[in-house]
């Protein structure tokens, strides 16, 4: 709970001053939290992005009820899981937009974000039983990462009440991937 609070405060600060100006030291000063206390959780500013992603995944996992997916298609399960992730991240949307914008010339930041999202996509593919020992299984995580990335950018600018633009984009991309997989599976 302490870490979650620090992540929230960190993301609020990122929203206020941007990624470039953000640092663990600045968080310590502004929030009057001893630096050595913050360093228990975050070794550097990049750590907060890593811990954030893991926190989001943990929150999703705690809300999952596998039995709700028993009669759902793989596509529907992936859709629900990704929408759960967007819902979990909603309060951090503007901070995430600033981080994404700053990442364009920050290879280390891109690497951390990519690694975490790839791990999440692997987790989602496992939950949806999408791996089936097919020769193309190794591509699934990359395709899902691509789908997530495009949908993420749509989500960042989606101000509709029910995230209808995000849902439409995600459904369109997952349907295209499903059609592609069916064609490839027929080889």
Each model region followed by its residue ranges:
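Amphipathic alpha-helical packing segments from all-alpha helical-bundle domains
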Residues: 107-130, 138-149
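Hydrophobic alpha-helical connector segments
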Residues: 51, 65-98
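Hydrophobic/aromatic-rich alpha-helical bundle segments in the mid-to-C-terminal region
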Residues: 130-176, 180-187
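Helix-turn-helix
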Residues: 5, 13-51
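Amphipathic alpha-helical segments used for helix-helix packing
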Residues: 88-108, 121-125
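Short, basic, alpha-helical segments at the C-terminal edge of helix-turn-helix-like DNA-binding modules
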Residues: 53-61, 68, 107
């Amino acid at each position: 709970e302490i870490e979650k609070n620090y992540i929230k405060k960190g993301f609020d600060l990122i929203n206020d001053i941007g990624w470039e100006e953000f640092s663990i030291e600045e968080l310590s000063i502004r929030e009057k939290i001893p630096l050595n206390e913050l360093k228990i959780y975050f070794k550097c500013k990049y750590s907060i992005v890593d811990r954030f992603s893991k926190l989001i995944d943990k929150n999703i996992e705690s809300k999952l009820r596998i039995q709700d997916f028993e009669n759902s298609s793989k596509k529907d399960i992936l859709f629900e899981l990704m929408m759960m992730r967007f819902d979990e991240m909603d309060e951090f949307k503007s901070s995430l937009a600033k981080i994404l914008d700053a990442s364009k010339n920050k290879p280390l930041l891109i690497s951390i974000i990519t690694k975490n999202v790839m791990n999440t996509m692997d987790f989602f593919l496992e939950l949806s039983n999408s791996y089936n020992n097919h020769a193309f299984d190794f591509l699934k995580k990359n395709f899902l990462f691509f789908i997530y990335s495009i949908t993420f950018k749509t989500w960042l600018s989606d101000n509709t009440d029910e995230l209808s633009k995000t849902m439409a984009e995600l459904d369109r991309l997952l349907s295209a991937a499903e059609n592609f997989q069916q064609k490839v599976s027929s080889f």
